[in-house]
Every structure is written in structure tokens, then in C-alpha cells.
Amino acid sequence: GACRMCVVEFEEGGPPGQQASCTIPVADGMVVNTKSEDTTELRKGIMDLLISEHPHGCLNCHRIDLCGPADICLRHVSVNDRCVTCPKNERCELKDTVRYMEMDLDTTLTYNNRHIPLKVKDPMWEMDMNLCIVCARCVRVCDEVRGDGALAFTDRSGRSLIGTSNGTSLLESGCEFCGACIDVCPTGALVERDHKWDKAVKKITSVCTHCPVGCQMTLEVDKRNRLIRAIPDRHAAANQGQACFKGKFGLEFVNSKARLRKSLIKTDGELAET
């Protein structure tokens, strides 16, 4: 409920006024309005505040409709504000939401870079708190879905950020490195270290082969036909959007040059392609 972008109005069976739907359990008799005029305007106001916590030079640039996914603007947007310098460029939920809401981002709010060092000491992933909008998704999925509680709100010079409760590394905090926080992060604040800057050109639905559970995954493949990212399928019956550290990060064996890519059969002591 920290970002409050899921605000709705209850016509029947719920509390009055706009409420964050993610904090209210579903009950019989509820009638919910998700797109009333007041609710839509409130969401836009909330979004305006959220992007003030994130580099948004490209989001409210008047040339956004003419800008391609790989263009680098040298006239209107500073280096630190550009979407192309973010590892989640063109797969950023924040940008997608701005486009979906058709927002007119003539905001007077400015983003001040926090100059927080990139956290790279933990294995397999990186944390950039300069891109965090403190939506609390990572904290909630770690606590409520994974039951881990490795992430928590922290304070830095009076500003709320995300970290560990005791200021330790994630490895020391008991993190399972399942990657659930990365999957729910709407910005580039939490990303996989491997293939961080690689862009996917196609997606494939497959099943994780590390164990017999049968977790369904969406695999992202780059233009060189390398597997660069695995995202758990939230609609799959076996895993319901979750994965273990092997399923999320154990991908490099697929890209190995020594990997067998065709079936072989041994005949007279010699292996031959079938």
C-alpha cells in the first residue's frame, strides 16, 4: 500500500473514499469502481509524486513521441535522467504506466539525484537506490509471499529507502536470492547482474529443468540467441509467479558452448547425431 497506485472506490461493502485495494481483503457484496473520474485524477496525482523520486527527464520530454528506444537525447535531458542509461529501458513499468494513463507530465517537480553508491557486494543482483520510488513492493513480496523478511525500510538522512533491517548485506540477512523482489520492482532499482544491459528480442515459455517441481518460466532471449533472463510465470499452477535461486539465476549452462544442442546416439562406440 505504499505507492497507492491501486486506489479504488467502494460503492458497496467497503470503506468510504478512495482506498488502496492491495490492503483490503475481498468480501462478499463488495462493489468496486476502479475507473471513476475522481479515482483516475487521484492516481495521476500520485504518479506525479512517484516520478519526482525517479529520473523522469524522458517521461515528460516534449519529444517523447519521436524518440526511439535507443535514441540518446543531447539537447533536453541530462545524462542521469535518460531512460537509455537505465538497465530496464523499454521494460520499465513506470514508463508503461505513464503511457497507459496518458499523463500530461508538465510537472514542476524536479528529481534530485541522491548520489547513493550502487550496491554490488551481494551475489547475482545489484541495487541502485537512486532509481527507487519506495513503492514497497519488494519489501512486501519478501515478507508476505516468500516469508523471508530480508528487506525492510531504512532511513538515510531523513529519507526512506530500502535495505536490510540491521544494515547488513543481503547474504547476512538471510536472503534466499529467489529474485522475487527483482520481478516486482517497477523500475531499475533492483536488477540481475548477469546480462544487466542486454535487451530481449523474443520471449519463450518453458519449464525450469533444475528439479521435478515443474515451475513455468518466461525466458527472454537476446539477438544473439542467448538466454539472458528468466521470469516466473505468475499464472502457472506449479509456482504462481515464484522461483528458487536456481530457477531465477541458474541460466548460464544454457549458453555454454560445450552444451549438447542435438541428441546423440552411440553406435559401435561412436556418438552420432540422430
What are these language model-derived features?
Residues 1, 11-15, 29-274:
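N-terminal export/assembly segments and adjacent metallocofactor-ligating motifs
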Residues 6:
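Acidic, glycine-enriched active-site microenvironments
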Residues 21-25:
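Structured interaction patches on ligand/partner-binding surfaces of diverse proteins
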